[in-house]
Curated annotation (Swiss-Prot):
CTP binds at L7, A8, G9, G10, G81, S82, D83, R84, N85, D86, T87. This is Ribitol-5-phosphate cytidylyltransferase 1. Keywords: Cell wall biogenesis/degradation, Nucleotidyltransferase, Teichoic acid biosynthesis, Transferase. Pathway: Cell wall biogenesis; poly(ribitol phosphate) teichoic acid biosynthesis. GO terms for molecular function: 2-C-methyl-D-erythritol 4-phosphate cytidylyltransferase activity; D-ribitol-5-phosphate cytidylyltransferase activity. InterPro entries: IspD/TarI, IspD/TarI_cytidylyltransf_bact, ISPD_synthase_CS, Nucleotide-diphossugar_trans, TarI. Belongs to the IspD/TarI cytidylyltransferase family. TarI subfamily. The record marks R160, K217 as: Positions ribitol 5-phosphate for the nucleophilic attack.
Length: 238
């Protein structure tokens, strides 16, 4: 089976002085979360579409779905975790407890605040996860990347045509993800910033799927302005 996990666990601290977490902020008169969710509803492949959100925002999430007449029976709202990967594992545990997990089950995980993903990106994630077990959505790095450990001087300048910017979705065979996460030490888990690193840390390959430049993550006031411009310009019409 195929599952979607929408990660709505952020509290929006980088958005500044706003009354709601960023996933509930309006984008063209509709919460960002609803824009994102509508993309997944259009994909018939999914057995369940699971939204993971902070415990204190679960009721608000359900109320928002009702307000915007989102009634797809596949949608479930659960409590997120303490961080991104803990939230993903909460979704996995929920799937396991309600449906069980088969060897070929896959999950497509996606940031609730990336509302401009496309049908193509979702379908290619599903197919690549089924075929390869783990997949990341990326775009070519446009700018030169530098690394610095002391935040003052350059340590290295990697070859740009080997650099990519990670987006979401990130998609996995569920058993592969579970088993890989279980192999990590507490120290390894504490420095994870990305779900695909769970797989990389256990020396397993992750396939790349091409994203889109406009598949942005809305985390700052500037991002919100860009997102509104994308909608007004019809840039992300799928």
């Amino acid at each position: 089976m195929k599952y979607a996990g929408i990660l709505a666990g952020g509290i929006g601290s980088r958005m500044g002085n706003v009354p709601l977490p960023k996933q509930f902020l309006d984008l063209d008169n509709k919460p960002i979360l609803i824009h994102t969710l509508e993309k997944f509803i259009l994909i018939n492949d999914f057995e369940k579409i699971i939204i993971a959100t902070p415990q204190q925002w679960m009721t608000h999430t359900k109320d928002t779905l009702r307000k915007f007449k989102i009634s797809d029976e596949r949608i479930e709202v659960i409590q997120g975790g303490s961080d991104r990967n803990d939230t993903i594992m909460n979704i996995v545990k929920h799937i396991e407890s309600t449906n069980g997990i088969n060897d070929d089950d896959v999950i497509v995980t996606h940031d609730a605040v990336r509302p401009f993903l496309t049908h193509r990106i979702i379908k290619e994630n599903i197919q690549a996860a089924l075929e390869y077990g783990a997949v990341d959505t990326v775009i070519d790095a446009i700018d030169t990347i530098v690394t610095s450990k002391d935040n003052q001087t350059i340590d290295a300048i990697p070859v740009r045509n080997e650099m990519y910017q990670g987006q979401t979705p990130q998609s996995f065979n569920i058993n592969l993800l579970k088993e890989s996460y279980a192999q990590l030490s507490d120290e390894q888990k504490s420095i994870l910033s990305d779900a695909c690193k769970i797989i990389v840390e256990t020396n397993k390959p992750v396939r790349l799927v091409k994203g889109e430049l406009y598949n942005i993550k809305v985390t700052t006031p500037y991002d919100l302005k860009v997102a509104n411009a994308i909608i007004r310009g019809g840039i992300a019409d799928d």
